[in-house]
Design a protein with these regions (language model features):
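Structural signal for interior beta-strand "rungs" in well-ordered beta-sheet cores
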Residues: 60-148
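Terminal amphipathic alpha-helical/low-complexity segments used for targeting or macromolecular assembly
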Residues: 1-63
Length: 148
């Protein structure tokens, strides 16, 4: 429950479009997708993988957000305009991370084992960023994709 409170606070702090905690709780799909993932992840860890994947699939249908239930997500997370977000099974997202839309933390085709990126605390990942493989980003930085 602390993660839910922390996520609500951080959305209000970092997103100028958020007019209240209630507004976020009821309407912000990034917040809702993150909380749904927290439920699915708990089920995944309990071995209730079919139910966890069912929740993930429903979240994908509703919000166009694909966070594998095996992925680990820290607290104080902001998922802003989160359409097109994809996070693989072995990905890890640290605390105080902000992620914008159309972002991928994916693998490179490896069938098993550790195959997804690890994002450290305090990272901002801009829209359209694609990070593949077992790359570890362990310090505060801003990742940006620039299109010309």
């Amino acid at each position: 429950m602390d993660s839910v409170k922390d996520d609500l606070k951080v959305v209000k702090e970092r997103d100028p479009a958020c007019i209240s905690h209630v507004h976020c709780f009821l309407n912000f799909k990034g917040f809702l997708a993150c909380q749904s993932h927290r439920v699915a992840h708990k089920l995944w860890l309990q071995g209730r993988k079919a139910l966890a994947v069912m929740i993930q699939n429903r979240v994908f249908e509703i919000f166009a957000v694909g966070i594998h239930p095996g992925a680990k997500i820290g607290s104080r997370i902001l998922l802003d305009h989160v359409t097109g977000l994809v996070v693989g099974e072995t990905a890890v997202i640290g605390n105080n991370v902000s992620i914008l839309h159309s972002m991928t933390l994916g693998g490179t085709g490896k069938a098993s084992g550790d195959r997804n990126p690890k994002i450290g605390d305090g990272v901002l990942i801009d829209a359209g960023t694609c990070i593949l493989g077992t790359l570890r980003l362990v310090f505060v930085l801003r990742l940006v994709l620039v299109l010309w």
